[in-house]
């Protein structure tokens, strides 16, 4: 079901506020990767310990469907606000009581925030925009992912350089509070006693996991997430050790990733509705597969390595974002449940990738590229032969 679309000016303000909120959330999630070594040094543990925490975070991510009923019960806007409260609590905990345990708890709370915030936002937008414009609208909100790398991570690098690994946590909590106030002002609360709040959440979830069309599309998300995470958990160490980069330089190299992701998201916004969601996803998978295979062989010099990373993250982002509008309409009668389950599959992929990434890196960086390419390529036959786009 798609409700009456928002008027354009109102939707524009809502998109800006929601994107700001996503930049804050995703900065908290993503700053761990380039500064993994700095954080591990600050905690006095080896980098592999942080990678293990990331893998556990992915395992926790598979609990995302349990949060779907909360979104239905409290409403879309209130779920977003609740998610931001959870985020601020996790960030503040690390700032006040830094330890390996508090970092782990914060990781879990940041993911819990995403369980609440992102399905609520995507469901709200899907209910207020027609499918013919869904790729554009969801593609625009995904600027909150690249914006974290373009704006948030360089800011975190600056703060770490001026202070220590703890310095970014409290400012991020303050920005999370600001995002909550902004979203509460521009996005209205759901009407009371909505139909989706009364629906049987267990029955909806069972109908989702029994739908081969949905499961195939979500499996594609799992595969490409696993591929990307197997690179995420090692690229900071690869660049720092291989090219002798400082923390600030590592923060600046993430700008390359941010620009590539921004272009990938813009590509989905521009092309997904024109090409068709399924065709756009197949294009992204094919290009992403090729870029992973090529990356290890262009890493002899920093300039070529950054060019390879640019291609990898551009094509990955195009593929992962192209899947979102497609998934949002596979079962519109259970949209929030589908989107919550999508986060679980995405998190499962992250868990697999985090577990594999360090081990592959110990064998040689070339195996990170080969494994990521193979995992991404497995998604192509699923889209070709199983997934059918709902018109």
Q: What residue ranges belong to the model's regions?
A:
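Juxtamembrane intracellular "pre-TM" segments in multi-pass secondary transporters
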Residues: 2-9, 189-217
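Extracytoplasmic gate region of multi-pass secondary transporters
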Residues: 33, 215-255
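Central cavity-lining transmembrane alpha-helices of secondary-active solute carriers
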Residues: 55-68, 255-264
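Conserved MFS/SLC helix-loop-helix module at the cytosolic interface between two early adjacent transmembrane helices
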Residues: 63-98
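Helix-to-loop junctions at the C-terminal end of transmembrane segments
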Residues: 64-75, 264-276, 361
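Cytoplasmic helix-loop-helix junction between adjacent transmembrane helices
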Residues: 107-144
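Helix-loop-helix hairpin linking two adjacent transmembrane segments in secondary transporters
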Residues: 141-185
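C-terminal transmembrane helical hairpin of 12-TM major facilitator-type secondary transporters
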Residues: 278-323
């Amino acid at each position: 079901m798609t409700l009456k679309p928002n008027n354009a000016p109102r939707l524009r303000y809502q998109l800006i506020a929601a994107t700001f909120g996503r930049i804050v959330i995703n900065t908290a999630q993503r700053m761990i990767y380039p500064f993994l070594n700095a954080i591990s040094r600050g905690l006095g543990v080896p980098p592999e310990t942080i990678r293990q925490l990331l893998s556990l975070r992915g395992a926790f991510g598979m609990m995302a469907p349990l949060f779907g009923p909360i979104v239905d019960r409290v409403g879309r806007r209130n779920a977003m606000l609740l998610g931001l409260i959870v985020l601020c609590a996790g960030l503040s905990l690390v700032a006040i009581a830094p330890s390996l345990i508090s970092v782990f708890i914060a990781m879990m709370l940041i993911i819990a925030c995403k369980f609440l915030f992102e399905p609520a936002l995507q469901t709200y937008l899907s209910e207020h925009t027609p499918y013919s414009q869904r790729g554009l609208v969801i593609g625009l909100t995904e600027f909150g992912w690249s914006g974290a790398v373009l704006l948030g991570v360089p800011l975190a690098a600056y703060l770490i350089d001026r202070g220590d690994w703890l310095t970014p946590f409290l400012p991020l909590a303050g920005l999370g509070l600001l995002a909550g106030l902004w979203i509460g002002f521009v996005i209205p609360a759901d009407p009371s006693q909505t139909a989706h709040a009364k629906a049987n959440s267990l029955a909806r979830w069972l109908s989702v996991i029994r739908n081969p069309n949905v499961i195939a599309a979500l499996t594609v998300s799992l595969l490409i997430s696993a591929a990307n995470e197997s690179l995420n958990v090692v690229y900071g160490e690869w660049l720092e050790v291989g090219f002798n980069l400082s923390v600030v330089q590592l923060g600046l190299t993430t700008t390359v990733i941010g620009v590539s992701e921004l272009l990938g998201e813009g590509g989905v916004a521009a092309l997904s509705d024109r090409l068709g969601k399924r065709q756009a996803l197949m294009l992204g998978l094919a290009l992403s597969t090729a870029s992973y295979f090529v990356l290890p062989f262009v890493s002899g010099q920093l300039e070529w390595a950054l060019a390879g990373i640019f291609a990898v993250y551009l094509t990955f982002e195009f593929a992962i974002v192209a899947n979102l509008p497609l998934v949002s309409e596979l079962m519109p009668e259970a949209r929030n449940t589908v989107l919550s389950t999508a986060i679980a599959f995405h998190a499962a992929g992250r868990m697999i990738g985090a577990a594999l990434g360090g081990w592959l890196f110990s064998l040689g960086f070339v195996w990170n590229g080969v494994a990521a390419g193979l995992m991404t390529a497995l998604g192509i036959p699923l889209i070709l032969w199983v997934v059918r786009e709902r018109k």
